[in-house]
Amino acid sequence: MNYRKTLIACYLGFVTQAITANFAPLLFLTFHNVYNIPLGKIALISSVFFITQLIVDILCAKFADRIGYRRCVVGSQLFSAAGLLGLAFLPQIMPDPFMGIIISTIVYAVGSGLTEVLVSPIVESCPFEHKEAAMSLLHSFYCWGSVGVILLSTVLFS
């Protein structure tokens, strides 16, 4: 059986995780200037992201075996996409833009938490000849995703 597509999907999952973790902080000054959100409240966005991710990490360990790893990983990408889409629209349509940002953050943090907990064990369980290399490359994709989102954002924001 060929696990190449599984490996590529896992690599892309870590890129998605990097986007969810790094995109909103690049917008903090935009949130402050456009929506007049105080910087003290903006600092809560990262806290909400990581607390949500931690809660998902804890809960995921209990439920992934019952629900299934594939469903959970596909769900992680759907949550991440929905949260990022929400970040584009919810602050503009909700009466309180900050609540739109927080709701979006919680949604994409769920996806990020699922990715964090599930992707490494999936790659580890695949019968690759050079598993150590696959795992090293997997974790480098988070870095590449971070670099990509920062470079692309820099180009688009300038």
Where are these regions (language model features)?
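C-terminal ends and interior cores of transmembrane alpha-helices
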Residues: 78-95
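Hydrophobic core of transmembrane alpha-helices in multi-pass small-molecule transporters
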Residues: 97-114
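Intracellular juxtamembrane helix-capping segments at the cytosolic ends
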Residues: 114-127
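Central cavity-lining transmembrane alpha-helices of secondary-active solute carriers
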Residues: 44-62
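Glycine-rich segments within core transmembrane alpha-helices of 12-TM secondary carriers
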Residues: 131-153
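Extracytoplasmic
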Residues: 5-37, 57-60, 120
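Primarily marks hydrophobic transmembrane alpha-helices of the MFS/SLC 12-helix fold
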Residues: 70-73, 101
